[in-house]
Design a protein with these regions (language model features):
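Short, flexible segments with low predicted structural confidence
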Residues: 49-52, 62-63, 123, 206, ...
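Helix-termination/interfacial motifs at the ends of transmembrane alpha-helices
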Residues: 13-32, 37, 152-225
Length: 253
């Protein structure tokens, strides 16, 4: 009797060990590779999550580099503009900035608008009579700030989408794994751990992968939303000062 009990315990331990091995990531991948026809949905879910993760990390890196660059450029460019002795030298300095530097582009748009309005002044029924210099420069600055603010949003929609949908994509894999477990129970006529370990493991792994993809995307979206808001506020402050400068001809700093 004791011997039978020991054999049963040993068999139970072996079954439990086999079940645990079937619930691992390596076993899931090996099963998906060896039986691709049975795991079409699993492959679609897994590849979708991998693509979503790759795209979200790509835009996270891009936004980190862009935020770091803008943080260093903001004070340097604006200070250089106001510290330059005259407007012509300040404009020339802005023209020497990199093409993707937003603060210099805003300043150049304001300068071009002021120069264009000045040339149009005095013409019969021309621009100078339709809009004042202040209104014309203000319109140009609004357009410039809107353009540069929009450029900051690159990848933000994707990060928000990944953060919101990746868990549900993982849940699709979870549901499919549970469905597979039920099918296996029906086929074998028993609900032993050996019968359902593989599908249940797949379900849990897909849930974990979905969360692994979504959580960094959510953190990145929230972080860059805050940093972009701070940068846009700097755009607005610089634009207001530029408006006063080009509309009146007097420095505000």
């Amino acid at each position: 009797m004791l011997q039978e009990t020991l054999f049963a315990a040993a068999a139970g331990g072996t079954n439990a060990a086999n079940a645990l091995s079937q619930m691992g990531f390596e076993h899931m991948i090996s099963e998906m590779i060896s039986k691709p026809g049975e795991f079409i949905v699993s492959w679609v879910v897994l590849l979708t999550l991998v693509i979503m993760s790759a795209m979200s990390w790509y835009w996270t890196v891009i936004n980190v580099l862009r935020s770091s660059r803008l943080k260093g450029q903001a004070d340097r460019v604006t200070s250089a503009f106001w510290e330059t002795p005259n407007a012509q030298d300040a404009i020339r300095l802005m023209e020497e900035q990199p093409k993707n530097e937003p603060f210099s582009k805003i300043a150049l748009d304001a300068a071009q608008a002021a120069a264009h309005h000045q040339r149009a002044e005095g013409s019969a029924a021309g621009l100078g009579e339709t809009l004042s210099r202040s209104e014309f420069v203000d319109r140009a600055l609004r357009q410039a700030v809107t353009r540069e603010s929009t450029n900051l949003q690159g990848g933000m929609t994707l990060l928000a989408t990944v953060g919101a949908t990746a868990p549900f994509v993982g849940l699709l894999g979870t549901g499919w794994g549970i469905y597979g477990a039920l099918i296996r129970i029906g086929a074998t006529g028993q609900a032993s751990i050996d019968a359902v370990a593989g599908p249940v493991g797949e379900a849990l792994i897909m849930t974990a992968i979905g969360l692994f993809v979504a959580i960094p995307a959510v953190f990145a979206y929230n972080f860059f939303s805050k940093t972009n808001s701070a940068t846009i506020a700097k755009f607005d402050t610089f634009a207001h000062d530029l408006h006063d400068f080009f509309a009146t001809g007097s420095r505000v700093r």
